[in-house]
Amino acid sequence: MNSIADSVSTALHLILDVDPGLATIVLRSLAVSATACAIACVLGLCAGAWLGVARFPLRGAVLTLLNTSLALPSVVVGLVLYLLLSRSGPLGFLGWLFSFKAMVLAQAVLVLPVVTALTRQAVEDVERAHGDHLRALGAPPLLRSLLLAWDERFALLTIVITAFGRAISEVGAVMVVGGNIDGFTRVMTTAIALETSKGDLPLALALGLVLLTVVLALNVVLSLLRRWRVRRDAARAATAMVPDAATPIPAPLPQPVSAHGRTLAAGTPLFTLRAATVRYGPVVALDGITLEITAGERVALVGANGSGKSTLLRLLQDLQAPAQGTVARHAGLRQAMLFQHPFLLRSSLRHNVALGLWLAGSTWAQAWRATPNALQRVELGHLRDRNARSLSVGQQQRAALAQAWARDPDVLLLDEPTASLDPHAKREVEALMEAFAAPRAERAMTLVFSSHNLGQVKRLASRVIYLEHGRVLADLPADRFFNGPLPEEAHLFVKGERI
């Protein structure tokens, strides 16, 4: 017992006196792990973000290989690297074996799968929930992955900290390729193992206490970051639930003649669907739909949940390919889509709107100059420098509408745009929809929107399409839909018995 107490006392003295030998080992450990973590994070964050959005034939096999690599024992990794770096190995000419570089390589190889897998999961979760918004703006996969990774930068920071903790706690690989040479390649974990086996408990205990302190500090930082994020998200959620202030309902504002130098006369076919079918596995979401949508129409898609409204909008926006049939679009058609839950990046409103314009083909300077006017149209000009995630739900929807409107589209697709809004915010968005659809400069503007609100459909639509089980059961002018005879299923829906 006295021996243990003496060892602990000596270990504490080594730490408090900043023993040179102890300090050298600690600093070398931090340098190796920090360098390895930096290399692994540069590669892993990029690879993981790309894997989160990319779709290719062998993706499943790649993910299986990635997940398998997470469970590789560190000594096996060290053995493989030893064989590669040995004099007779293919990388022996580098002369890295039993060096600082070999240990950095070993830890980087161990940490890389962790960073890649965690980053992929974080980005893929956001892509699955909100990726359609960026796709509708025209963001290609690589840019989408970078935008989503940047938007999840808090999660990425926690991944980096986790990776460093994994690296500095590793022992097997660095011992095999580093050799644990005193004064050259000895790090905390290997020194603890060696000094314990030699019976030098004070130094082993001192290094163990320092290592535990480093790991504890990393976990404290992670805990504080999580608590801060929970509080921040709760505050933003509370803000989002606050009803919008009673800002004036915007009047229809004249919009400049199309920036792309042409007009679409009323009646011009924009979309032509021929026997279009969409399947999600065994489920038929759209079943042989044939219809045409022309310029100047205000088309409402109605039907019960799961009837195919959102899928039809995604098909029109080219976010979904038909399994059978065809979808033809007018040449050069400019379109934009608004979702029930818009996705705005954790950046200013102005940045979000400018991003939409930039993706539409404007230079960043042009997009930046155009955003104040776009935000003013939706009565958000005074909030242009606010973080988009700090706004209320209604303000976020109006911001997304500004992002779509600024692109000067010929047709605006909206997926239940007012479903989650308070009454005043609903009226504001409806007024903006009417402003968009108002004819101007001989140019017919087109709306296609889905809604469960039949009062809204009466106010806004010139044509109503009723869907059930992926089929069009009624396609009529709005007056005839609400006042004329209907198929029994549509009649029950209008009466409120098939919601």
Features from the language model and the residues they span:
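A short, surface-exposed alpha-helical micro-motif characterized by mixed small hydrophobic
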Residues: 457-459
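Catalytic Walker B motif of ABC-type/P-loop ATPase nucleotide-binding domains
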Residues: 412-415
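Conserved ABC ATPase "signature" region
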Residues: 140, 365-383
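The feature captures the beta-strand-to-loop junction immediately N-terminal to the Walker
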Residues: 302-304
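Conserved ABC ATPase signature
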Residues: 387-391, 395
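Helix-to-loop junction immediately C-terminal to a conserved catalytic motif
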Residues: 317
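C-terminal transmembrane helix and the adjacent membrane-cytosol boundary/short C-terminal tail
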Residues: 114-130, 135, 147, 205-257
